[in-house]
Amino acid sequence: MSQKKNIKRMLTVLIMALLSTISFAQDVNLANGVEPLPSGEQTPGSEYTLVFHDEFNEPNGTLPNTKVWRYCTRYPKVIWARFLSSSPEVAYMQDGNLVLCAIPNPDKLKDNVEMLSGGIETSQSFTFRFGRVECRALVNPFIGNFPAIWMMPKTTLGWPKGGEIDIFEQIDNEQRCYATVHSAWTQSHGNEPHSGNLRMPMNRYYIYAVEWEEDVLTFFVDGKRVYQYKKQNDSQEQWPFDKSNFYLILNQSVGNGSWAKKPDVNHTYEMLIDWIRVYQKQKHIPTVISVPMTKIKECTESNDVYLLQGTKMEMKESELPKGIYVSNGKKFIK
């Protein structure tokens, strides 16, 4: 550590006392480089604590915060991922929204694909197990449209063994949203329901949500239950949803004819995301959150860096945004 950082650590106890009124959610916001929840906004209930959110209120043209979000990786043979790009034209802030696009490729000599699409995820910065995810979004139905708000596991297991939680999908020009669960079980038991949908006009914003508990996944649109998927046994095949942490994915893709139809490659597809928020019940928040704000004590024996609420930061210390962290049993401020 540099001398400057050591001095900061020596002042930690005093600073923690001064910060003792800061909520855990605010601590997470500081560490994730996102702003506090707007005043007057409702939460799911007193049993939940806000542990992550992004309001996407940066100035117009700002790109997604790379300390929180990372661009999804392109996989040419995977439908949703075949056109993914880190181009600033497919993921940016505009009028208080994250805008995700699938656009005609303006330079096929540079990148030989028909379209470029936007997608971002949190696998390296934020993962969690159990809780409630809410995302306020607006989509624009059109032939070939295929936007999604979803989650994947942080696991070495191949798809679909680790599971997949699709909070929201919409296809083509349908006035309908879908909520779906994928696992090895759903693949091998095709006759068993693992998806629900709701017909509704898609010309306005909705809050899409999932409540993820130890034995059930419940999906909502504006508070109305759309679908529920229950645990049937303890197997990895049927219920992988208590075996791994999951991370968030937001993307605007296009179909290929297998579910969503083939796109009009000259059309610009667009999804607007106002905000995304994750809440957890106290029992599901990692126990490191219990470290007193006014006392430094041993809480980890490794050199890994954690947020106060327990999320491991998958980045070098030099890359951390400003905030309060725990490492080597001590809190420090960067």
State what each model feature region is:
Residues 3, 21-24, 47, 86, ...:
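Compositionally biased regions
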Residues 26-286:
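GH16 jelly-roll
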Residues 288-334:
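C-terminal outer-membrane/trafficking sorting elements
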Residues 3, 17, 26-30:
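N-terminal targeting leaders of exported, membrane, and organelle-targeted proteins
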Residues 3, 41-48, 296-301:
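Extreme N-terminus of proteins, especially the signal/transit-peptide cleavage junction
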Residues 12-21:
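Bacterial N-terminal signal peptides
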Residues 2-12:
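Bacterial N-terminal signal peptides that target proteins for export
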